[in-house]
Amino acid sequence: MKFVDEAKILIVAGDGGNGCVSFRREKYIPKGGPDGGDGGDGGDVYMVADENLNTLIDYRFTKSYRAERGENGQSRDCTGKRGQDITINVPVGTRARDLATGEIIADLTVHGQKQMVAKGGFHGLGNTRFKSSVNRAPRQRTMGTPGESREVLLELMLLADVGMLGMPNAGKSTFIRAVSAAKPKVADYPFTTLVPSLGVVRMDSHQSFVVADIPGLIEGAADGAGLGIQFLKHLERCRVLLHLIDIDPIDGSDPVENAKIIISELEKYSDKLAQKPRWLVFNKVDLLDADEAKQKAQAIVEALGWEGDYYMIAAINQEGVKKLCWDIMEFLKVTPREQDIATALAAEEKVDFMWDDYHKEQLENPDLEDDDEDWDEEDDDGVEFIYQR
């Protein structure tokens, strides 16, 4: 199945049903009084994380999702039926962003996590609500409010503990094949990897971590060169980044300049991503003598001004790979995950537009909201609508 990590959709919550103007008409009961019921609330739109999904391709074809409208109120004080909610299933790791405001309205990182993304409209009031000692035959009612409508950008970001970045042909796919059961394509030409892939590294029966492999970066990626930086977002949730450097590039390029290009493109994309813990990993050391490889690695480290530790590996024959993986495992044990925005979104949210406040104001000040054009004192069947401006 094709890997799609972005999609735009329209979500529309249901409108609230209108209130009803009705009077009780029954034999032997003169002046029965008002009995118009309230409308029903509009349906809400929810998103749910589903671990059985791994792509957003379905949302490239179905772009509009609408919840059901609440039914209007009826006579005999019958309340309208509430609109049915709809649920949109998305892969775990999906983030939903409101395109109009840029606000993140959902970030689903756990299977089964559910988040409301569009609130249904509130129901209107029937004329029964407006009866009083001085107004025994009210002809007022309120209309239901519109449901929320949003144009949303869905972004799928892989959930991994470790992210790999580097130039094309730095050996990222070879590394992930060496440490996990993942089998990404490996070949001797650039951009063999076209889509991100995940591999689970099992150190023993109780310890493991997930590695993400993304397509290589080249100079100008931030401006769209190569495959651009569209896949860097998959590294945002990682706790540590492995910067793989080909210690002896077959094309004769300078490893120092290659490393600087990656660092520069990383900073252009996101300061937050550039500040994540990053380890230098020199790959393909088997192509050089041991002493020559050490001298070359040390020269690169000094040229970059690198002050942290670095590793020398040969992913193709797993030289130095085991030690690197155990060091990663120990680092992850003491490095907690960043608190997801989903934690805050999952907390019980307070709706700004409160039902009680909305109707209390209308009931207390019906005369202030009258629309004179809708009222005819000479027409016994006239109905007065109350609008919230």
From Swiss-Prot:
<keyword id="KW-0460">Magnesium</keyword>
<dbReference type="InterPro" id="IPR006169">
    <property type="entry name" value="GTP1_OBG_dom"/>
</dbReference>
<dbReference type="InterPro" id="IPR006073">
    <property type="entry name" value="GTP-bd"/>
</dbReference>
<dbReference type="InterPro" id="IPR027417">
    <property type="entry name" value="P-loop_NTPase"/>
</dbReference>
<feature type="region of interest" description="Disordered">
    <location>
        <begin position="362"/>
        <end position="389"/>
    </location>
</feature>
<dbReference type="InterPro" id="IPR014100">
    <property type="entry name" value="GTP-bd_Obg/CgtA"/>
</dbReference>
<dbReference type="GO" id="GO:0042254">
    <property type="term" value="P:ribosome biogenesis"/>
</dbReference>
<keyword id="KW-0479">Metal-binding</keyword>
<dbReference type="Pfam" id="PF01926">
    <property type="entry name" value="MMR_HSR1"/>
</dbReference>
<keyword id="KW-0342">GTP-binding</keyword>
<feature type="binding site">
    <location>
        <begin position="213"/>
        <end position="216"/>
    </location>
    <ligand>
        <name>GTP</name>
    </ligand>
</feature>
<feature type="binding site">
    <location>
        <begin position="166"/>
        <end position="173"/>
    </location>
    <ligand>
        <name>GTP</name>
    </ligand>
</feature>
<dbReference type="GO" id="GO:0000287">
    <property type="term" value="F:magnesium ion binding"/>
</dbReference>
<feature type="compositionally biased region" description="Acidic residues">
    <location>
        <begin position="364"/>
        <end position="383"/>
    </location>
</feature>
<dbReference type="InterPro" id="IPR036726">
    <property type="entry name" value="GTP1_OBG_dom_sf"/>
</dbReference>
<comment type="similarity">
    <text>Belongs to the TRAFAC class OBG-HflX-like GTPase superfamily. OBG GTPase family.</text>
</comment>
<keyword id="KW-0378">Hydrolase</keyword>
<feature type="binding site">
    <location>
        <begin position="283"/>
        <end position="286"/>
    </location>
    <ligand>
        <name>GTP</name>
    </ligand>
</feature>
<feature type="domain" description="OBG-type G">
    <location>
        <begin position="160"/>
        <end position="333"/>
    </location>
</feature>
<dbReference type="InterPro" id="IPR031167">
    <property type="entry name" value="G_OBG"/>
</dbReference>
<dbReference type="GO" id="GO:0005525">
    <property type="term" value="F:GTP binding"/>
</dbReference>
<comment type="function">
    <text>An essential GTPase which binds GTP, GDP and possibly (p)ppGpp with moderate affinity, with high nucleotide exchange rates and a fairly low GTP hydrolysis rate. Plays a role in control of the cell cycle, stress response, ribosome biogenesis and in those bacteria that undergo differentiation, in morphogenesis control.</text>
</comment>
<keyword id="KW-0547">Nucleotide-binding</keyword>
<dbReference type="InterPro" id="IPR006074">
    <property type="entry name" value="GTP1-OBG_CS"/>
</dbReference>
<feature type="binding site">
    <location>
        <begin position="314"/>
        <end position="316"/>
    </location>
    <ligand>
        <name>GTP</name>
    </ligand>
</feature>
<dbReference type="Pfam" id="PF01018">
    <property type="entry name" value="GTP1_OBG"/>
</dbReference>
<keyword id="KW-0963">Cytoplasm</keyword>
<dbReference type="GO" id="GO:0003924">
    <property type="term" value="F:GTPase activity"/>
</dbReference>
<feature type="binding site">
    <location>
        <position position="173"/>
    </location>
    <ligand>
        <name>Mg(2+)</name>
    </ligand>
</feature>
<dbReference type="GO" id="GO:0005737">
    <property type="term" value="C:cytoplasm"/>
</dbReference>
<feature type="binding site">
    <location>
        <begin position="191"/>
        <end position="195"/>
    </location>
    <ligand>
        <name>GTP</name>
    </ligand>
</feature>
<dbReference type="InterPro" id="IPR045086">
    <property type="entry name" value="OBG_GTPase"/>
</dbReference>
<comment type="subunit">
    <text>Monomer.</text>
</comment>
<protein>
    <recommendedName>
        <fullName>GTPase Obg</fullName>
        <ecNumber>3.6.5.-</ecNumber>
    </recommendedName>
</protein>
<feature type="binding site">
    <location>
        <position position="193"/>
    </location>
    <ligand>
        <name>Mg(2+)</name>
    </ligand>
</feature>
<feature type="domain" description="Obg">
    <location>
        <begin position="1"/>
        <end position="159"/>
    </location>
</feature>
